[in-house]
């Protein structure tokens, strides 16, 4: 079990003990348990219930949303973390936060906002901004510290510990902090000697891939967009493997071999015959449970074996036990498990996200975001919520004011964005 220090539990704004306890009661929770609770009770997390995962939140009876996906990632993260001796609350919290910065319409909305945002838009960087600025919890002399999470918690939530712009002026496609948040990133990364994310963030990222690949395929099967019979269609499978290797890395042969291993699982064969009967629903749920357990077990076992084989690589003055944790150690994902996850992700992308109807819907979604951005920027601060009006007033440059509008739109649910788009269209029609 890794021993976390007072340095790991430090918060940007110091906090004393709570003063509202009933007489003779006391606070038993640790710092990371409090971090987890703050995220769990946040409005930003609740808003994910009305944000797209693969199919929209209103497609079908029980589709996954960004919120349910985040809960599943959090559970998987906790399981892997416990197996590796990491703090389970910290790992679970990282899973809860991993999509909290996503705007309406998921990656499609992310791309649209990136087109209009001076300084770029990235869901992971927006996560840090929400946790450290936008989600109201801790205010000191009119300065917002967001949820005021611990150093280790913010570090665990940051899987891309980079700013958008590098010292040489080049830019990163994926990054965990906007340039204006560089000081916050430096604070949470203090003590790191390389550019790798901490163990807890690695666990979160892996858990996201597992949940995404398994559960999104499950949703695709239920919606009728996916059938696992494709794993037996060698012609279709070959084309699928080529596209998957191009999109997610590795080779087509690795994905074809992964399909062969999956075909050998009885639960895959049962789920391939899904027909909405009670037995089919049970078979599908058995499959998702088995696959999650298959990949969690593979990752945990491989990582622990690597630690046992080379404990001296982790042992130092700051980590005398040589345990895995924070900046000590790397997650090991076996090649076979990684290939199977890539194959399942490919199935989800090609048979759900790249369907013509889905692509046409994405075009309409982008148009809404552009329309709302133009409307809110033109009428700001009056078009902004009260809290964002305050951010607007405090902004000193056009770029900062534009960022406030982007923050407002990114915080919206999809339902609210669509109402705002209708309002913006009405105003445009009136002005024409």
Q: Whereabouts are the PLM-identified features?
A:
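Alpha-helical phosphate/pyrophosphate-handling elements in metalloenzyme active cores
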Residues: 59-90
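Glycine/alanine-rich phosphate-binding loops at beta-alpha junctions
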Residues: 15-68
């Amino acid at each position: 079990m890794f021993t976390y220090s007072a340095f790991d539990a430090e918060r940007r704004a110091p906090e004393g003990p709570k003063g509202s306890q009933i007489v003779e009661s006391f606070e038993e929770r640790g710092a990371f348990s409090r971090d987890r609770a703050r995220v769990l009770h946040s409005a930003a997390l609740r808003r994910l219930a009305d944000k797209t995962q693969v199919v929209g939140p209103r497609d079908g009876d029980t589709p996954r949303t960004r919120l349910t996906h985040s809960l599943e990632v959090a559970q998987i993260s906790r399981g892997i973390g416990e197996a590796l001796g990491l703090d389970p609350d910290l790992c679970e919290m990282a899973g809860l936060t991993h999509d909290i910065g996503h705007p309406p319409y998921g990656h499609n909305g992310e791309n649209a906002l990136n087109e209009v945002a001076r300084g770029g838009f990235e869901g992971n960087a927006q996560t840090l901004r929400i946790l450290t600025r936008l989600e109201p919890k801790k205010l000191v002399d009119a300065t917002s510290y967001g949820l005021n999470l611990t150093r280790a918690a913010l570090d665990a939530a940051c899987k891309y510990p980079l700013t958008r712009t590098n010292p040489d002026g080049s830019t990163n496609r994926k990054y965990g902090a906007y340039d204006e948040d560089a000081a916050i990133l430096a604070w949470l990364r203090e003590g790191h000697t390389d550019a790798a994310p901490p163990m807890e963030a690695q666990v979160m990222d892996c858990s996201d891939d597992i949940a995404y690949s398994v559960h999104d395929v499950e949703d695709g099967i239920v919606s009728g967009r996916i059938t696992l019979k494709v794993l037996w269609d060698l012609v279709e499978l070959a084309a699928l493997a080529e596209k998957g290797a191009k999109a997610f890395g590795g080779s087509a042969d690795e994905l074809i071999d992964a399909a062969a291993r999956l075909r050998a699982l009885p639960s895959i064969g049962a789920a391939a015959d899904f027909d909405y009967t009670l037995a089919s629903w049970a078979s599908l749920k058995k499959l998702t449970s088995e696959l999650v357990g298959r990949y969690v077990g593979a990752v945990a076992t491989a990582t622990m074996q690597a630690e046992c084989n080379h404990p001296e690589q982790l042992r130092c003055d700051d980590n005398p036990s040589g345990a895995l944790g924070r900046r000590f150690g790397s997650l090991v994902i076996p090649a076979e498990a990684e290939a199977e996850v890539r194959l399942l992700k490919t199935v989800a992308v090609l048979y759900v996200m790249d369907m013509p109807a889905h692509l046409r819907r994405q075009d309409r979604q982008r148009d809404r975001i552009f329309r709302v951005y133009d409307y809110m920027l033109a009428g700001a601060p009056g078009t902004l919520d009260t809290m964002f009006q305050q951010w607007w007033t405090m902004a000193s440059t056009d770029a900062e004011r534009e960022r406030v509008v982007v923050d407002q739109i990114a915080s919206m649910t999809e339902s609210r964005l669509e109402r705002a788009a209708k309002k913006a269209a009405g105003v445009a029609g009136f002005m024409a």
